[in-house]
């Protein structure tokens, strides 16, 4: 299957090629709180005509309480167990766009399922941008500490090496949400384009040796 290089085609045409090549895989956004996963994910889903799910919202539906309340009542370990159950259930609904919680991709079981059944996209942002964004939601459970900025910095140190294992990394800094969403779509199509060409080259090499 030959695919035009995404740099030379508009988003509307990329949509057709991407959806046909994506098959039943999910586009999964990973990254820290404040990276813009939910907002960007909704825009990507709208552009591609795919269903969008926010795993945190789905967790709250399943628990019938907010994540902040769940943390207070049951603790983080129980939350992570529920997060895994909900995330793996959502992956079965692919193709879709999924915004995951900040700790989801850190879970090896979740990460393996995402890597097998989806294309993972890390939305990366620096400390100041993240803090500016999360300050609008001061009830984030993991930031209920004496020094939220230092806590965020430690989370970055712990999690960024794991987020870096994602298939794609997209900077989520000062660009508009629309621009970041477009960057994601073009990068996904480029990833698929490379994937298809590598597969075709592999088949061609096998044929030569037959």
From Swiss-Prot:
Highest taxon of the lineage: Bacteria
Keyword Magnesium assigned: yes
Molecular function GO labels: ATP binding; magnesium ion binding; shikimate kinase activity
Positions contributing to Mg(2+) binding: 38
UniProt: ATP binding residues: 34-39, 140
EC number, as in UniProt: 2.7.1.71
Signal peptide as annotated in the record: none
Principal subcellular localization: cytoplasm
Cofactor stoichiometry and binding remark: Binds 1 Mg(2+) ion per subunit.
Subcellular location(s) of the protein: Cytoplasm
GO biological-process terms attached to the record: amino acid biosynthetic process; aromatic amino acid family biosynthetic process; chorismate biosynthetic process
Stated name of the protein: Shikimate kinase
Primary gene name: aroK
């Amino acid at each position: 299957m030959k695919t035009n290089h995404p740099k030379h085609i508009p988003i509307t045409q990329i949509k057709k090629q991407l959806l046909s090549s994506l098959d039943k895989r999910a586009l999964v956004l990973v990254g820290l709180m404040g990276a813009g996963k939910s907002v960007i994910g909704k825009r990507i889903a709208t552009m591609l005509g795919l269903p969008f799910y926010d795993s945190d919202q789905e967790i709250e539906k399943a628990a019938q309480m907010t994540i902040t309340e769940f943390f207070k009542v049951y603790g983080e370990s129980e939350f992570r167990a529920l997060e895994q159950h909900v995330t793996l259930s959502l992956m079965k609904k692919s193709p879709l766009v999924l915004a995951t919680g900040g700790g989801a991709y850190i879970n090896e079981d979740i990460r393996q399922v995402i890597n097998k059944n989806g294309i993972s996209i890390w939305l990366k942002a620096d400390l100041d941008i993240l803090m500016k964004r999360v300050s609008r939601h001061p009830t984030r459970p993991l930031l209920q500490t004496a020094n939220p900025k230092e806590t965020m910095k430690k989370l970055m140190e712990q999690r960024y090496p794991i987020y870096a294992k994602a298939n794609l990394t997209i900077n989520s800094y000062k660009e508009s949400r629309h621009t970041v969403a477009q960057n994601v779509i073009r990068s996904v199509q480029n990833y698929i384009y490379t994937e298809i060409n590598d597969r075709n080259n592999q088949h061609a090499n096998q044929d030569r040796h037959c």
